[in-house]
Amino acid sequence: MAAPTMKERQACWGARDEYWKCLDENTEDASKCKKLRSSFESSCPQQWIKYFDKRRDYLKFKEKFEAGDFQPSKMTAKS
């Protein structure tokens, strides 16, 4: 598989950004962003989609942690 061209990368990043914006505006309700998710999936290589999904999860976790909203699980609290 050839590496994506600059135009393909920009289309992927744009689709990702639109999807993430939709999630932010709809309090993470993915059902309201299905069309944008489809566009994201059709614009990006599968490996990139996995990476971006994990990256978003990490960034949201980090945001909560830094804001002091993180609550450790009961298993973690016992350790």
From Swiss-Prot:
Motif Cx10C motif per record, residues: 33-44
GO cellular component, one term: mitochondrial intermembrane space
Transmembrane segments: none
The keyword ATP-binding appears for this protein: no
The keyword Mitochondrion is assigned to this record: yes
A molecular function GO annotation: copper ion binding
Function: Involved in the maturation of the mitochondrial respiratory chain complex IV subunit MT-CO2/COX2. Thereby, may regulate early steps of complex IV assembly. Mitochondrial respiratory chain complex IV or cytochrome c oxidase is the component of the respiratory chain that catalyzes the transfer of electrons from intermembrane space cytochrome c to molecular oxygen in the matrix and as a consequence contributes to the proton gradient involved in mitochondrial ATP synthesis. May also be required for efficient formation of respiratory supercomplexes comprised of complexes III and IV.
Protein name as catalogued: Cytochrome c oxidase assembly factor 6 homolog
Species assigned in the record: Bos taurus (Bovine)
Gene behind this protein: COA6
